[in-house]
Amino acid sequence: MARKALIIKQQRPQKFSTRYYNRCKICGRPRAYLRKFGVCRLCFRKLAHNGEIPGVKKASW
């Protein structure tokens, strides 16, 4: 899990626009962020398996 200090630091307004980065809305993870859903890959997988993301289903081909 992300450290609380880093999450709070990222939420404050940044002096320069290039300092902004995306974090997962659930766990605060900065990597493997899925922009369309606003969560990281781990939380996305958990939500998709529970059926909490509408229109998402496991791929099979």
Swiss-Prot record:
Q: Record's GO cellular component, any one?
A: small ribosomal subunit
* Assigned protein family: Belongs to the universal ribosomal protein uS14 family. Zinc-binding uS14 subfamily.
InterPro entries, alphabetically? Answer: Ribosomal_uS14 (IPR001209), Ribosomal_uS14_bact (IPR023053), Ribosomal_uS14_CS (IPR018271), Ribosomal_uS14_sf (IPR043140)
Extract the Pfam families matched here.
Answer: Ribosomal_S14
Biological processes annotated in GO: translation
This molecule's function is given as: Binds 16S rRNA, required for the assembly of 30S particles and may also be responsible for determining the conformation of the 16S rRNA at the A site.
**Which UniProt keyword terms apply here?**
Metal-binding, Ribonucleoprotein, Ribosomal protein, RNA-binding, rRNA-binding, Zinc
Q: What is the superkingdom listed in this entry's lineage?
A: Bacteria
Q: How does it assemble?
A: Part of the 30S ribosomal subunit. Contacts proteins S3 and S10.
What remark does the entry make about the cofactor? Binds 1 zinc ion per subunit.
Looking at the keywords, is Ribosomal protein present? yes
What is the originating organism of this protein?
Caldicellulosiruptor saccharolyticus (strain ATCC 43494 / DSM 8903 / Tp8T 6331)
List the lineage, top down: Bacteria, Bacillati, Bacillota, Bacillota incertae sedis, Caldicellulosiruptorales
Q: Mind telling me which PROSITE patterns this protein's record contains?
A: RIBOSOMAL_S14
Task: Specify the protein name.
Answer: Small ribosomal subunit protein uS14
What this protein needs as a cofactor is: Zn(2+)
Q: Which GO terms describe its molecular function?
A: rRNA binding; structural constituent of ribosome; zinc ion binding
What residues does Zn(2+) bind to? Answer: 24, 27, 40, 43
